[in-house]
C-alpha cells in the first residue's frame, strides 16, 4: 500500500511547513501595527463660531 509509505510526501510536508513558517509571519507582522492609536489630550478645545453670511 503506497499511501502508508511516508517517504515521498513527508519531506514535502515538512518543507512546505518550513517555508510557510519562515516567510509568512514576517509579512503578516509587518502589517500588524499599521494604525497605531494616538494619545488624545484631556483638555477640551473651544470651538470657533461659524460665520453664516446668509443670515
Swiss-Prot record:
Recorded topology in the membrane: Single-pass membrane protein
InterPro entries according to UniProt: ATP8_metazoa (IPR001421), ATPase_protein_8 (IPR050635)
GO biological process entries: proton motive force-driven ATP synthesis
Function statement: Mitochondrial membrane ATP synthase (F(1)F(0) ATP synthase or Complex V) produces ATP from ADP in the presence of a proton gradient across the membrane which is generated by electron transport complexes of the respiratory chain. F-type ATPases consist of two structural domains, F(1) - containing the extramembraneous catalytic core and F(0) - containing the membrane proton channel, linked together by a central stalk and a peripheral stalk. During catalysis, ATP synthesis in the catalytic domain of F(1) is coupled via a rotary mechanism of the central stalk subunits to proton translocation.
Upper lineage: Eukaryota, Metazoa, Chordata, Craniata, Vertebrata
Subunit text: F-type ATPases have 2 components, CF(1) - the catalytic core - and CF(0) - the membrane proton channel.
Subcellular location: Mitochondrion membrane
Transmembrane feature ranges: 9-29
Name used for this protein in its record: ATP synthase protein 8
Biological source species: Xenopus laevis
GO terms for MF: proton transmembrane transporter activity
Amino acid at each position: 500500500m503506497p499511501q502508508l509509505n511516508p517517504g515521498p510526501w513527508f519531506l514535502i510536508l515538512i518543507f512546505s511547513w518550513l517555508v510557510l513558517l519562515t516567510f509568512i509571519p514576517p509579512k503578516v507582522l509587518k502589517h500588524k501595527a499599521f494604525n497605531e492609536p494616538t494619545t488624545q489630550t484631556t483638555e477640551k478645545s473651544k470651538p470657533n463660531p461659524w460665520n453664516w453670511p446668509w443670515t
